[in-house]
């Protein structure tokens, strides 16, 4: 919990992924409960990759019982891309159906209409990809998710603020949007993300800046922090906030936020 304690006075909440990239990790609901015990607000991700509709509803109710009230729903990464490639994917519900399930539980019934004894009080989130190859479909998906109960959105990583601004002007989302930030740790990482992660397009100009630092790790980190900080600053007038996916660089977040404010 050292990283959480380091950042607790700088951020509103901590995002907890559910076996991100299909790599096995502790259940985020359990981690979220432990953070709540430390006075830290969690945002828990839930996917349909590993659970059918019975298990998803049980997890939502379990999260609520443990005090977790912020949940972001998504499909999840296919198991074949993770560290357990033989795991069977479930994907019983689509993303909008996950939201409908959470909304139904919030309103006092399960997906089949059975009444609950008590109701959770969840703030329901969804994801959006402003770099999707088919923006019209992505915008339609955002509207569908909002209609299904999404109260806020988190986006894929943003590197071209101008293109993102155009997306927002076209989408005109009626829910708060948190722009995604992933610091560029290396040229290799940037190239991997451009090749493997749908919707991520790191401009060559940014890659060249990182490349110019050569093998000087401190200089690479400083350039990356400057890029991330300037992106956070630029998003200030476009989004309702940001979510920084530091991927092991959580100790760099204070510097990123400092650059963003200067």
Label each region the model flagged.
Residues 14, 63, 145, 149, ...:
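Conserved, mostly hydrophobic/aromatic
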Residues 2, 89-112, 116-117, 127-132, ...:
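Active-site pocket-lining/capping segments in soluble small-molecule metabolic enzymes
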Residues 1-13, 145:
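Conserved N-terminal beta1-alpha1 strand-loop-helix module at the mouth
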């Amino acid at each position: 919990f050292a990283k959480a304690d380091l950042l607790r006075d700088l951020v509103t909440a901590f995002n907890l992924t559910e076996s991100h990239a299909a790599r096995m990790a502790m259940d985020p609901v359990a981690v979220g409960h432990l953070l709540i015990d430390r006075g830290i607000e969690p945002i828990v991700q839930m996917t349909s990759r590993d659970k059918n509709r019975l298990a998803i509803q049980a997890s939502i109710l379990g999260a609520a019982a443990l005090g977790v009230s912020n949940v972001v729903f998504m499909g999840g990464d296919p198991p074949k891309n993770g560290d357990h490639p033989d795991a069977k994917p479930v994907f019983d519900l689509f993303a909008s159906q996950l939201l409908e399930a959470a909304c139904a539980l919030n309103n006092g019934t399960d997906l089949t209409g059975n009444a609950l004894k008590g109701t959770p009080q969840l703030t329901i989130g969804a994801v959006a990809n402003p770099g999707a190859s088919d923006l019209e479909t992505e915008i339609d998906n955002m509207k569908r998710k909002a209609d299904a109960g999404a109260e806020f959105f988190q986006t894929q990583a943003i590197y071209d603020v101008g293109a993102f601004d155009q997306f927002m002007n076209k989408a005109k989302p009626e829910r708060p949007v948190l722009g995604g930030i992933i610091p560029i740790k290396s040229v290799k990482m940037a190239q991997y993300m451009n090749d493997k992660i749908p919707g991520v397009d790191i401009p060559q100009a940014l890659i060249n800046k990182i490349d110019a630092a050569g093998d000087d790790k401190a200089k690479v980190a400083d350039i990356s922090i400057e890029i991330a900080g300037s992106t956070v600053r630029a998003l200030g007038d476009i989004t309702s906030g940001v979510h920084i996916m530091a991927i092991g660089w959580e100790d760099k977040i204070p510097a990123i936020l400092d650059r963003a404010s200067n």
